[in-house]
């Protein structure tokens, strides 16, 4: 059996400010978030000589601006746009997994100087009220995702054990997501006592990735993986969500709900 062990005292800090600005012709939500991560740890000085000295890992400071604008085009229709930056830190295991080297070993080690995954998202859409209880919404979106983790195998010449190899996660991959979402919202009405929300999304997710045999080839030769733009394994082209509720309010009220999801990919 295998196990992971690490004992670290990393520091996380975050704060944000947000404001809503209402004008005669449009409404704007603006904000900014600040995140700070200090691993308070050390990482290998040279990837080609991992058994040598360690150096202190750097602090990561992240500013995330976000903006949303709603522009009424009729009494019952709204155009909306949003833009934002989002960050996600790697798991503690990928940051702090202990370095264990030895004869015949090919360990996966942590790298506490990893950068956070960064997503920049754009969305543009329209919402239209069809009746007192019914509304539709359509939007298109695009996500640019950088600094995804890629598992790298590195061959090196150990001064103690001779030819050796190890694996490490590095910020090397990226992906892009493009898609469209259509939704229908029905508010509860006294006649049917039913409320519902239905939405359908179509998206494509592509990024740089390695072929299924590249990792083994790399472990034998020490060559860099050959990367190309391909559909990613976690892509879901079609996603349909539905929530339907029937309720009767009051002291002796009751309610029943149905939730469903269908997806491909």
Language-model region placement:
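Signature of Gram-negative outer-membrane beta-barrel scaffolds
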Residues: 1-74, 100
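Extracellular loop and loop/strand-boundary signature of outer-membrane beta-barrel proteins
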Residues: 2-5, 47-56, 107-112, 165-171, ...
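Hydrophobic, lipid-facing positions within transmembrane beta-strands of outer-membrane proteins
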Residues: 11-17, 63-67, 110, 120-124, ...
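Residues on the lipid-exposed face of transmembrane beta-strands in outer-membrane beta-barrel proteins
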Residues: 15-21, 32, 67-71, 124-128, ...
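Outer-membrane beta-barrel strand-turn architecture
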Residues: 17-25, 36, 63, 71-75, ...
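Repeated loop/turn-to-beta-strand initiation elements of outer-membrane beta-barrel proteins
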Residues: 25-28, 76-79, 132-136, 191-196, ...
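Surface-exposed extracellular loop regions of Gram-negative outer-membrane beta-barrel proteins
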Residues: 38-47, 71, 75-121, 142-167, ...
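Gram-negative outer-membrane beta-barrel transporters
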Residues: 141-144, 155-156, 161-264
């Amino acid at each position: 059996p295998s196990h992971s062990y690490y004992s670290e005292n990393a520091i996380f800090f975050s704060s944000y400010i947000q404001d809503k600005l209402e004008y005669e012709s449009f409404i704007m939500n603006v904000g900014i978030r600040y995140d700070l991560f200090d691993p308070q740890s050390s990482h290998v000085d040279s990837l080609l000589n991992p058994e040598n000295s360690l150096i202190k890992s750097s602090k990561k400071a992240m500013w995330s601006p976000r903006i949303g604008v709603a522009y009424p085009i009729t009494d019952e229709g709204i155009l909306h746009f949003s833009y934002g930056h989002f960050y996600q830190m790697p798991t503690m295991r990928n940051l702090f997994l202990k370095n264990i080297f030895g004869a015949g070993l090919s360990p996966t080690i942590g790298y506490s100087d990893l950068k956070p995954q960064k997503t920049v998202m754009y969305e543009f859409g329209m919402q239209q009220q069809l009746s007192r209880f019914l509304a539709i919404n359509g939007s298109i979106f695009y996500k640019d995702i950088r600094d995804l983790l890629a598992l790298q195998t590195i061959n090196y010449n150990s001064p103690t054990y001779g030819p050796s190899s190890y694996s490490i996660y590095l910020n090397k991959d990226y992906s892009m997501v493009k898609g469209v979402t259509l939704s229908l919202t029905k508010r509860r009405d006294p006649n049917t006592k039913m409320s519902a929300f239905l939405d359908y999304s179509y998206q494509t997710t592509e990024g740089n990735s390695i072929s299924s045999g590249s990792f083994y080839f790399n472990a034998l030769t020490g060559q860099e993986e050959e990367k190309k733009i391909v559909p990613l394994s976690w892509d879901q082209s079609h996603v349909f969500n539905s929530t339907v509720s029937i309720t009767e309010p009051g002291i002796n009220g009751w309610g029943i709900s149905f939730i469903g999801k269908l997806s491909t990919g």
